[in-house]
Amino acid sequence: MKKTSSRYLAGSLAAHGSILVFALMGLEVIIMISPFAFFFYSVFSPIFNFLNHYPATAWLTTFFLPHMILPPTLGLRVIRIAGSVLFLAGALTFLICALQVYLGKIFKWGLARHGLYRFIRHPQYLALAMWGIGMAILWPRFIVLVFLSIMFVLYYYLSRDEERRMLARYPESYSAYMASTGMFFPRIKAQRSAVQPGHLLSSPWRHAVIPILTVAVVLSTGFLLREVTLKSLPFETEGNLSMISILPEDNPLVGTIVQAIAANKTDTTLAFLKSEKDYLGYVMPPDYVMQGMIANTGSDFHLFKQHNTVAMISDWVLHPFEHLRRSPAAHMAKMHNVEPTVARRHHCPLGKNDASLDCSICPYRRVILVEVDGNGGQRLTGSATLSISAPRIPVGFVDINAATGEIIESQRVGTATAWAGIPTPAI
């Protein structure tokens, strides 16, 4: 009995430890826009930088779904909405089930057989899985998927061990309960089908096959989603310049913008563009909220300094697309009870605080340009500029009138983003 208890304790610690690490990796997005970003990255930046430094591990820090680009297709938008739904539903379900179990222990209600426990034996673990999948969609780094798959495996074995202990303690009642419920999903068949000899679950190889298969399926899904994402992005290319818009409504403007910049790249104001290098340009509103993840364009876009973390996180979860269209001034306006349109004009990065201007139809756009290293002189265009193996270094930004092609201002930037050397999203 002691051996069984020790084994369960070890399994429980491993499983809960995995979800703690997963939560830290997944909730990085919350921490990175909070005043605690410095403390978090003082611990984890060496890990991220180490992984990002080697081609064999650089994929772990990259993203498999759009995070700062508004999803361009219906399928990707549905996935993004599902992320918010699963994140919230999983968290709420877990809290309800946890209350049911722990109140049952306090008041000695016996086995939990009501609510979701009437249909499945481990709704808490199912809820954690839902929350985890939602978190992985909301903050889609590959390293989050790795820990998510490990969490799946550990909680599967922890569930089986819990069932063995319950059968030993309540052989008749728990056996009947198992016959009428599913492990993680409601049972469809009335009779519990026995595992046949030779089946994977009865094979001695199962302890190796199940973890490997789980990790492989989860990561393969991530790579598939990344490929679908890259193929859905509408690039415009002119010479060594490839461009993409952050917002889909700006897609018609990209062709004019890339041609205007290509025609002026020999100008001294665009001296940061070299003919022998390849560049990826992100087209966005001048006050686009997440531009600090691409380049350090000024303290207004250092989100960890804005002191409105809760509002931004709520917006990110509850408004999957509109949060990308809101400027940093919008949240500050709400905090100080100021008209958002007035605040947006007042904080316009181009200094165009004109009451007659309507920011919603503003013709000006900012283009942040990053240099893409082709590794060995290979020229990269289109989706190849987002290759996992291609380093991307910020070089400058251009403010342009998208209607006329007139360049208003250009500025060189440092080689780091607003988060210094931390690998940030490229999509």
Regions found by a protein language model. Give the residues of each.
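Membrane-anchoring alpha-helices and their flanking helix-loop junctions
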Residues: 1-113, 131-426
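Conserved SAM-binding loop
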Residues: 119-126
